[in-house]
């Protein structure tokens, strides 16, 4: 009994009625609830003075009960009500203090006093977070989702699955520009990185458009991979390029790396590839949308390993030989040497592409040996991967695991990983990293690895952190 009293004593008056608890099908009328709001009536012409000079924000209802506001019209002409939060002005001392503050600014001759404004709060007044808290079982929360254009995509823990349809209806109603809500199933469960979607509410329309760092990206969300959480990562990596960079994106998707790189960094060469024909289709659309000349990005639709072994290797050697033999004009300012940047953003599988680099240039050994060491391009590879544990481990373990995964695939005499950037936490025991490798020519010219059976593509099942990570001492 004591525990229940404490629980309910902490509950706010301004929350949806308890009758909606456990609701799985949206019934808006059930959210209607009469509330008596404490108010003070003031002259409408005094509203500006009160807003500027009297600090009442901690006591007013705030902005969570839209369209209800802190200041509303009174029934009397020329009058306004200051609307207070019932929980915050329960004490007589607090109410007296507020009246004194108002009289000090407006004058003691003003007849100010507390009264009550009766209002029905409805579904329209409650925000999504308050509705979810009221509907879901006590102790279970849901507040995180990702929006891509007009599409909201959700992941649900098992205990929330029975409530997915009402959550979807609420999001459809409450989130600006939302027209479609889907449940996002396993990601990257096939070679095309398609999303396994369940339509929960709204239109069955997955063609949408988003803006990222000022660029337009159009896509069929059901047929390509897009993650809005990676916008800073796209900007970080593309910001490493310059006018002498040779950029090769082995898993380009619809262009989140190559488009900003091309427009903002103006690399010497940009070549994009993706195995998914839909990604290639929408990349070409986005090249046009962003007014990029077609010849600035060479686009391929092929396996990433073959792209690395054939297209990247051929292209780099050709350009390097051209640059190393080109004569310099007198008084010409020497240009910095070009660098190779290969991006592999397929975190569930990209680490399996690393063996393709060993010996990728071996068939050009004679030509490369003629290139002076100071004319040989530096090779940088950005390999995205997941480091995950099945038990609680120290935070430092995840970076060590990411490095180990790369070393296991390169099998070189030393680690080729020069930097491991933590991109984001995927779940409580799963981290996403970008491992940056620098590949020496000894590795690129070494005997290639024998072909191995294709590794199974890991599913990227949980996008939301399911719980906070337990701190483990090292």
Curated annotation (Swiss-Prot):
Database matches in Pfam families: TRM5-TYW2_MTfase, TYW2_N_2
EC top class named in words: transferase
Gene3D superfamilies linked to this entry: Met-10+ protein-like domains (3.30.300.110), Vaccinia Virus protein VP39 (3.40.50.150)
GO CC field: cytoplasm; mitochondrial matrix; nucleus
Superkingdom field: Eukaryota
Keyword Coiled coil tagged: no
UniProt feature, compositional bias: Basic and acidic residues: 465-474
Electron transport as UniProt keyword: no
Coiled coil regions in record: none
Key words of the record: Cytoplasm, Methyltransferase, Mitochondrion, Nucleus, S-adenosyl-L-methionine, Transferase, tRNA processing
Primary localization class, coarse: mitochondrion
Region described as Disordered: spans on this chain: 452-474
An example Gene Ontology biological process: tRNA N1-guanine methylation
Family: Belongs to the class I-like SAM-binding methyltransferase superfamily. TRM5/TYW2 family.
Name the record gives this protein: tRNA (guanine(37)-N(1))-methyltransferase
Organism: Caenorhabditis elegans
Taxonomic lineage from the root: Eukaryota, Metazoa, Ecdysozoa, Nematoda, Chromadorea
């Amino acid at each position: 009994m004591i525990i229940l009293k404490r629980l309910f004593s902490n509950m706010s008056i301004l929350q949806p009625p308890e009758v909606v608890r456990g609701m799985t099908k949206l019934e808006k009328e059930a959210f209607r609830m009469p509330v008596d709001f404490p108010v003070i009536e003031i002259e409408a012409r005094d509203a500006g003075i009160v807003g500027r000079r009297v600090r009442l924000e901690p006591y007013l209802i705030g902005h969570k009960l839209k369209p209800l506001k802190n200041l509303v019209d009174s029934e009397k002409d020329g009058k306004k009500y200051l609307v207070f939060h019932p929980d915050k002005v329960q004490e007589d001392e607090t109410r007296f203090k507020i009246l004194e503050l108002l009289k000090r600014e407006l004058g003691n001759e003003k007849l100010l006093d507390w009264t009550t404004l009766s209002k029905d709060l409805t579904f329209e007044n409650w925000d999504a977070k308050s509705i979810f808290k009221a509907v879901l079982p006590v102790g279970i929360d849901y507040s995180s989702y990702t929006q891509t254009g007009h599409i909201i995509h959700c992941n649900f823990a098992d205990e929330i699955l029975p409530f997915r349809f009402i959550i979807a209806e609420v999001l459809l109603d409450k989130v600006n520009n939302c027209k479609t809500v889907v449940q996002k199933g396993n990601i990257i469960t096939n070679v095309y990185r398609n999303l396994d979607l369940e339509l929960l509410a709204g239109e069955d329309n997955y063609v949408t458009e988003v803006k990222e760092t000022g660029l337009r990206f159009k896509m069929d969300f059901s047929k390509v991979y897009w993650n809005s959480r990676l916008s800073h990562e796209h900007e970080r990596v593309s910001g490493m390029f310059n006018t002498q960079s040779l950029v090769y994106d082995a898993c380009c998707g619809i262009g989140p790396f190559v488009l900003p790189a091309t427009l903002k960094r103006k690399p010497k060469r940009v070549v994009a590839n993706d195995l998914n024909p839909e990604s290639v289709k929408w990349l070409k659309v986005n090249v046009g949308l962003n007014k990029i000349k077609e010849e600035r990005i060479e686009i391929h639709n092929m396996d990433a390993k073959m792209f690395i072994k054939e297209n990247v290797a051929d292209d780099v050697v050709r350009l390097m030989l051209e640059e190393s033999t080109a004569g310099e004009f007198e008084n010409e300012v020497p240009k910095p040497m070009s660098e190779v940047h290969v991006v592999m953003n397929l975190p569930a599988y990209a680490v399996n592409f690393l063996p393709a680099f060993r010996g990728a240039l071996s068939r050009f050994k004679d030509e490369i040996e003629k290139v002076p060491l100071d004319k040989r391009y530096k090779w940088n590879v950005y390999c995205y991967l997941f480091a995950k544990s099945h038990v609680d481990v120290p935070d430092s373990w995840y970076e060590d695991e990411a490095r180990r995964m790369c070393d296991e695939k390169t099998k070189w005499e030393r680690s080729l990983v020069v930097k491991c950037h933590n991109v984001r936490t995927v779940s409580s025991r799963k981290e996403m990293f970008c491992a940056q490798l620098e590949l020496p020519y000894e590795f690129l010219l070494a005997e290639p690895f024998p072909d191995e059976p294709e590794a199974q593509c890991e599913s990227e099942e949980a996008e939301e952190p399911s719980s906070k990570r337990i701190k483990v001492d090292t």
